């Protein structure tokens, strides 16, 4: 059993009373609150600032993605919030409990699925889940019932008697998530949950995660460098780079506010393209205009309405477009706008 998942809380009666208190809490405060959270590491004679003053709130029931390249500070932030790392400075509360002063209560309030496989290779799948329940202070009977529930929820029932070492990568990740949910935590951290999985396995895993969230109302915070994952799954995206939060909003708002739509228009002459560019520069929604021969490239908010106005006004001045295309922005465009770097290229460079 991996220490990533069993975080070392007490299994005493007091711990179980604390758990009852957690479950009875109202919605009077955020599920996660951090203030100026930092983490520094000594690397030889050099001091590495992995996390630099992260301040954020996550409401109960939210699904939030921490997006950034490898080495941005995402996993370090999660490890501090799960009490696996002590912050250098700053503070944080989980379900109202301080991560430094109430470690047992914090640990009972969350499930954590790390990047590595958390289950013991020689254990049988169902036995691993039962053992996890016992470590949380559950009775053997309750642990067995909960194990069977999770096996069914994550389509692992037929694999319950198999050794963990015989599972496929996707099956192991589903087991990891089951381990994180044994004690029905109100908060689940997923650290790069689909790294290394093929697209079909990733989609299957997300189907399970989203279904369980709908049924249980669990708050989920995940780290990922998969842009599509953050864009399509998360209700809110927090972009982290070099240990700092550089953007925080819905994916739709980030793309609209920071990147904008890309309009590409072609004309029958360079003169006509120049006329269209001149018109575009006068529109308040247009952010950038570039002309290359008879092609005009525009970055603009509200791309559809901008294009309609642009085509009408350019045509009135004798510049009729031959073609006009709109490309919607991606979260990589957002990262590029914020940092001058591509998130895909940054992630690939670190990985290599």
Q: Where are the language model's segments positioned?
A:
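A short, flexible loop at the N-terminus of ABC-type nucleotide-binding domains that lies
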Residues: 24-31, 39-53, 103
């Amino acid at each position: 059993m991996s220490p990533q998942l069993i975080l070392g809380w007490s299994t005493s009666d007091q711990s179980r009373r604390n758990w009852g208190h957690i479950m009875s809490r109202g919605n009077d405060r955020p599920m996660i609150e951090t203030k100026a959270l930092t983490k520094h590491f000594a690397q030889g004679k050099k001091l590495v600032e992995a996390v630099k003053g992260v301040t954020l709130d996550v409401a109960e029931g939210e699904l939030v993605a921490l997006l950034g390249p490898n080495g941005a500070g995402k996993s370090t932030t999660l490890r501090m919030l799960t009490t696996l790392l002590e912050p250098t400075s700053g503070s944080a509360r989980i379900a109202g409990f301080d991560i430094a002063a109430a470690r047992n209560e914090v640990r009972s309030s969350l499930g954590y699925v790390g990047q590595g496989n958390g289950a013991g290779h020689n254990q049988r799948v169902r036995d691993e889940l039962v053992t996890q329940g016992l470590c949380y202070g559950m009775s053997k009977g309750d642990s067995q019932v909960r194990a069977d529930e999770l096996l069914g929820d994550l389509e692992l029932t037929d694999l319950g008697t198999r050794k963990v070492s015989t599972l496929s990568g996707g099956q192991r990740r589903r087991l990891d998530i089951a381990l994180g949910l044994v004690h029905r935590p109100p908060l689940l951290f997923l650290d790069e949950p689909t790294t290394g999985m093929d697209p079909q396995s990733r989609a299957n895993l997300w189907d399970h995660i989203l279904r369980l969230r709908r049924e249980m109302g669990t708050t989920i915070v995940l780290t990922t460098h998969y842009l599509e994952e953050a864009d399509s799954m998360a209700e809110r995206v927090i972009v982290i780079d070099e240990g700092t939060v550089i953007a925080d909003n819905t994916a739709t708002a980030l793309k609209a506010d920071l990147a904008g739509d890309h309009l590409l228009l072609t004309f029958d002459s360079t003169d006509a393209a120049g006329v269209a560019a001149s018109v575009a520069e006068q529109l308040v929604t247009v952010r950038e205009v570039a002309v290359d021969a008879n092609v005009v490239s525009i970055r603009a908010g509200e791309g559809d309405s901008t294009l309609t106005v642009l085509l009408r006004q350019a045509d009135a001045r004798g510049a009729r477009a031959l073609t006009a295309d709109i490309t919607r922005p991606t979260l990589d465009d957002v990262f590029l706008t914020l940092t001058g770097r591509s998130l895909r290229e940054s992630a690939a460079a670190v990985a290599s």
